[in-house]
Every structure is written in structure tokens, then in C-alpha cells.
Amino acid sequence: PCCGSGGMFVQATKFIEAHGGNTKAVNVYGQESEPATYRLAKMNLAIRGISYHLGDKAVSTFSDDQHKDLKFDYIMANPPFNLKKYAEYGEFETDPRWKGYGVPPASNANYAWILHILNKLDVNHGIAGFLLANGALDDSDTLEIRKRLIENDKIEAIIVLPRNMFYSTDISVTLWILNNNKKGGPWHGRQLRNRTGEILFIDLRTWNSNIYEKKYVRLTETEKIG
């Protein structure tokens, strides 16, 4: 929904290649509101031979969804944190993407991103991962939306990441995982247990051994989680 220059798509493709997957079977869809960044994303993907669909123009995904009738198996996003002035379009109050959850605050787009992403997921097995500022976890103005997300069993995991993960800011952020199907069963060669009614919480803020290097979750640390 806010693909920027397409860096996430490039890295996702590299991940698929590294794990023996078929990148030709992957269709990439994205949208970007800034014209210069939109053009850069198209160039970035084209020179790497990645098949992409970024809509017909650079425009906000809230006011003009370029993939309006599509649902997706997987969604990744790193939306602008605490975006203001995103709700300046005529149908904001009655936007069908908010149905069943309530209208998100017009002064902060955090929960508008969440509800938009949830709306775009395949209803049977869609999974999303996206980053938000930590303040989204306890924002009093969005309490009812969070309550309904939990009641509808849409949240798979909340992972608070270490500080200094970004070059532009030293704040800690949260990785949200949404899942439309937390039931157990076979999945890409693995057998998943039933996680219905469960939410995994992980706080990684103490993993801060070197504040001068950008962080990667090391194998020993993933073993601690497992």
C-alpha cells in the first residue's frame, strides 16, 4: 500500500531465490503516492526483471486504491509512522474498509493502514506483516478498533523490535503480523498447530548489544524465541 522505491519487493525476491523458490511465479503489486518515488520503484523493479503492478499513477492508497478489486495472499508494508492529513477525501467517514471496526482517527493514519491492509488480504488465508510506531499499541483513540481486531482473531503476533533498526531514526518500532487463518494444518511443507485465540508477543528491545550497528536477529537469538 506504500511501496516506496520498491526495496521490500527486491529483498523479498532475493529471499525467494535464496530458498529455491520460483520468482517467476510471484506477482508484485504496490502503490506509492510520491511521483518521484513511484518512478524510482518502477525503474528499480524493471532493471531486476521483477514483474510488477504499481497502478496507473502515483496516488494515495486511501483516496484512490489502484488495486481496488484485488485481494492478496501476502502483504508487506513499512508505512510512514504517524502520518497526518491522509483523510482528506470525500468518502473517509463511510469508507467500506472501516466496516466492522470503526472509523480510524483522521489525525493519524496508523490504524487506517491496519484496516486497509486487513481489507486487502485474502479472506481465507491472507497474511500481512508491517511496521508501525510503538505508540500504535496503546493509543487510547483506537482502543475499540484494537478490541475488535482481537475479538475477530486477526492478530497473529506483535513483535517489538530493538532500537536503531533504521538509519533515519533510533526509535523502537513494532512488527505486526495479521493472519486471516490461524487454524492448524499443512502449509508450504510444514505442519502448523492451531493458534486460534492466541497472540504471540515478543519484546526485543533488550537485544541492543551494539547501538552503532544496524540490528539483525542472530541464530542464537531466534533459538531463544523458539
Positions of predicted regions on the chain:
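Conserved SF1/SF2 helicase motif Ia
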Residues: 20-24
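Class I SAM-dependent methyltransferase "Motif I" SAM/SAH-binding loop
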Residues: 2-6
